[in-house]
């Protein structure tokens, strides 16, 4: 019934098993991959024909985590998986990026890749198995695909590279780098690093590419024994006559458009050229598909821009290959925000805002490997007006989530540890103008906003987006690329870091001829650009502000006996709720007895601290307290000296003379000074007004003058 093909291989410390032919047989391709109990199912379905008028490649990649993979039931009312989590979105992008460039030009058939996580080993992240399984599923499907693709995660500790480190190793690693590529070339890099050098980063990329060959070879074996016949697909032949005609009608105007340095003027001119060519073709009686004409014009644009750069001519905006666009920086832009910065680089601009919160503001993430809390959030938004367009405004798209994550990776290594700066931090980057490199503008603006908020970052962090154009043996590396250069180039990569090293590196490579030497040149030029931007940032803001904004919460920490936590919380939370409401403070209690009090009011914090210390204080024998008389008894009175701490004031301890009536000396609600004489094994306390007055040097208490009072005194003496 099943033609099941299985391939097993050892990959570093992991045993991997790939199989096809048993599950999801109606898909174009399906592979089940097991990597030390992390199991993923990757499926591929490709449409046999492209839709009429299709002018782009409709590839979708969906990475889906099932909670049963971790033996859990989803939370919420409906008890089933809902919208994709941030991790699912980021992993979908991670898989998409190296696969997309390997489909042939002109292939516009719809392709859907779906990866389900069916079982999770908490120590083995599922992203690498998912990427390898997706590549294998495409390879066995027979679709036109220039793969297979391999992938590997690389760590770095004590001068050694680690292959596919587990989560415990990653927690202590100075590097978390994912690299994907084919047998011959690297296609994608995504990484976070603890200020590592360009040499170490490039070495990690090369090491990962070497180690992924094990997985690529296993995929070849799987295809040889279990692959489906290759599709009989051929790209449509080029209409050379149409290419020549479009070139004749539009080339000169396109060249003129690319002499315009301002993006808006250039974009408008290009639209006019496209419309003009279409109109002239119609006038000439040339029948042509509009999509085909647009593609020819785009190819002409690409040749113009690439040719100018490779010939040493100025770039689109007039710069040479190494120059960073003009930078303008302004901090404290928003009066009520805790920290803010406006970072402008050419026609790219980011308004980044920092907000400080308490531990209760941390994001709680219910991941497959277990719940954890995140004290640093970075959210990136790019509304359509940033590019002078109209469009949908709403929940963030995949691109926005990915750009936010990249900027976050760049800043994490310089953040202070929680015991140095206990605040929860949220950065929001609002892209108000975009012409390339908006994620790196978010890094620069984010660092400045943190410093403006008074966050003691370890160093300035800057980011720069780089491009590369390769034709045969000629290549050019571009610093601080524009949006058009991004689309027309062969590689774009983003590097962020400090004066000391790289904190984040992202590469996307569209061709397979880029060597280690070319990447070395590109990284060296990126460092030059990064240091230039860092110089501008350091001149604008040399260090973090020493004082927090007056609108930011202040925090103090109180340590109590963990057994007293219930007293602070109170029955049904009554005590903590009253404290929060009456003092206007946010109060967070940890299991170890650490209490954090946060408020914009120093008076409110002081009052909350005083009351918490009162609730949790231990009564000390021999200490004098101001107490409140709660109840009178025939033989004395009950006095409250601390919250929840009542003691007996015996009649003999009220005054030196004989006391006949307790009410002659103290009243309910009266404040009295009492000394704690002793506490028995049951916690019962003996109090004394006599001893307190004697120690403090006051005149001994006497009863109010009343009939018989003098006799009582003489009798006691």
Curated annotation (Swiss-Prot):
Annotated HAMAP family: PNPase
Domain KH: 553-612
Superkingdom field: Bacteria
Name the record gives this protein: Polyribonucleotide nucleotidyltransferase
CDD domains: KH-I_PNPase, RNase_PH_PNPase_1, RNase_PH_PNPase_2, S1_PNPase
EC identifiers of the protein: 2.7.7.8
Organism classification: Bacteria, Pseudomonadati, Pseudomonadota, Betaproteobacteria, Burkholderiales
Cofactor names: Mg(2+)
Role this protein plays: Involved in mRNA degradation. Catalyzes the phosphorolysis of single-stranded polyribonucleotides processively in the 3'- to 5'-direction.
Pfam family, one: S1
Catalytic activity, as annotated: RNA(n+1) + phosphate = RNA(n) + a ribonucleoside 5'-diphosphate
Protein family: Belongs to the polyribonucleotide nucleotidyltransferase family.
Record carries keyword Transferase: yes
PANTHER family named among the record's database cross-references: POLYRIBONUCLEOTIDE NUCLEOTIDYLTRANSFERASE, POLYRIBONUCLEOTIDE NUCLEOTIDYLTRANSFERASE 1, MITOCHONDRIAL
Compartments where located: Cytoplasm
A molecular function GO annotation: magnesium ion binding
SMART domains referenced in this protein's UniProt entry, alphabetically: KH (SM00322), S1 (SM00316)
Residue span of region Disordered: 690-717
GO cellular component labels: cytosol
Recorded name of the encoding gene: pnp
Chain sites annotated for binding Mg(2+): 486, 492
Keywords in alphabetical order: Cytoplasm, Magnesium, Metal-binding, Nucleotidyltransferase, RNA-binding, Transferase
GO term, biological process aspect, one: mRNA catabolic process
InterPro entries named in the record: ExoRNase_PH_dom1, ExoRNase_PH_dom2, ExoRNase_PH_dom2_sf, KH_dom, KH_dom_type_1, KH_dom_type_1_sf, NA-bd_OB-fold, PNPase
The S1 motif domain, residue ranges: 622-690
């Amino acid at each position: 019934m099943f033609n099941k093909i299985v391939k097993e291989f050892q990959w570093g410390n992991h045993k991997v098993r790939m199989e096809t032919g048993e599950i999801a047989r109606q898909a174009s391709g399906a592979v089940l991959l097991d990597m030390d109990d992390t199991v993923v199912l990757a499926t591929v379905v490709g449409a046999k024909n492209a839709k009429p008028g299709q002018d782009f490649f409709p590839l979708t990649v969906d990475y889906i985590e099932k909670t049963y993979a971790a033996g859990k039931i989803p939370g919420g009312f409906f008890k089933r998986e809902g919208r994709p989590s941030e991790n699912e979105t980021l992993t979908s992008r991670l898989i998409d990026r190296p696969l997309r460039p390997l489909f042939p030009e002109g292939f516009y058939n719809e392709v859907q890749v779906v990866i389900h996580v069916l079982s999770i080993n908490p120590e083995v992240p599922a992203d690498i198995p998912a990427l390898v399984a997706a590549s294998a599923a495409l390879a066995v499907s027979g679709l036109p695909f220039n793969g297979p693709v391999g992938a590997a995660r690389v760590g770095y500790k004590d001068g050694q590279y680690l292959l596919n480190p587990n989560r415990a190793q990653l927690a202590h690693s100075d590097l978390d780098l994912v690299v994907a590529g084919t047998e011959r070339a690297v296609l994608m890099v995504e990484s976070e690093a603890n200020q590592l050098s360009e040499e170490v980063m490039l070495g990690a990329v090369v090491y990962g590419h070497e180690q992924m060959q094990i997985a690529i070879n296993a995929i070849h074996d799987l295809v040889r024994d279990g692959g489906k016949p290759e599709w009989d697909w051929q790209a449509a032949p080029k209409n050379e006559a149409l290419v020549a005609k479009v070139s004749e009608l539009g080339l000169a105007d396109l060249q003129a458009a690319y002499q315009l340095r301002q993006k808006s003027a250039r974009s408008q001119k290009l639209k006019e050229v496209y419309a003009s060519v279409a109109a002239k073709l119609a006038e000439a009686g040339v029948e042509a598909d509009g999509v085909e004409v647009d593609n020819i014009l785009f190819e002409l644009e690409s040749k113009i821009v690439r040719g100018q750069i490779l010939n040493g001519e100025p770039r689109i905006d007039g710069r040479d290959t190494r120059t960073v666009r003009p930078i303008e920086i302004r901090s404290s832009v928003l009066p009520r925000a805790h920290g803010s910065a406006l970072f402008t680089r050419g026609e790219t601009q980011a308004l980044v805002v920092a907000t400080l919160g308490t531990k209760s503001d941390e994001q709680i993430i219910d991941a497959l490997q277990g719940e954890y809390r995140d004290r640093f959030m970075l959210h990136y938004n790019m509304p359509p007006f940033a590019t002078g367009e109209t469009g949908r405004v709403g929940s963030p798209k995949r691109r926005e989530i990915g750009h936010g994550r990249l900027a976050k990776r760049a800043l994490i290594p310089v953040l202070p540890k929680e015991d140095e700066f206990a605040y929860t931090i949220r950065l929001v980057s609002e892209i108000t103008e975009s012409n390339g490199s908006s994620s790196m503008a978010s890094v620069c603006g984010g660092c400045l906003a943190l410093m403006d908020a008074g966050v003691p970052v370890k160093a300035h962090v800057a980011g720069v987006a780089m491009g590369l154009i390769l034709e045969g043996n000629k290549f050019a590396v571009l610093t601080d690329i524009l949006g058009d250069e991004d689309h027309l180039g062969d590689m774009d990569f983003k590097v962020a870091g400090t004066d000391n090293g790289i904190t984040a590196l992202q590469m996307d490579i569209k061709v397979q001829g880029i060597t280690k030497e070319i990447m070395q040149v590109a990284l060296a030029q990126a460092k030059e650009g990064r240091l230039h931007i860092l110089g501008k940032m350091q001149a604008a803001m040399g260090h973090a502000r020493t004082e927090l904004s007056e609108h930011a919460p202040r925090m103090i920490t109180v340590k109590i006996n963990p057994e007293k936590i219930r007293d602070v919380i109170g029955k049904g939370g009554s005590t903590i709720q009253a404290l929060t409401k009456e003092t206007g403070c946010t109060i967070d209690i940890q299991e170890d007895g650490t209490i954090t009090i946060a408020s914009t009011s120093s008076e409110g914090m002081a009052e909350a601290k005083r009351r918490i210390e009162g609730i949790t204080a231990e009564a000390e024998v021999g200490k004098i307290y101001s107490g409140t008389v709660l109840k009178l008894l025939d033989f004395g009175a009950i006095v409250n000296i601390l919250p929840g701490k009542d003691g007996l004031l015996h009649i003999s301890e009220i005054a030196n003379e004989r006391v006949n009536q307790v009410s002659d000396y103290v009243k309910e609600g009266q404040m009295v000074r009492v000394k704690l004489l002793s506490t028995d094994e049951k916690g019962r306390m003996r109090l004394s007004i006599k001893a307190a007055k004697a120690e403090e040097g006051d005149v001994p208490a006497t009863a109010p003058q009343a009939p018989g009072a003098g006799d009582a005194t003489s009798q006691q003496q």
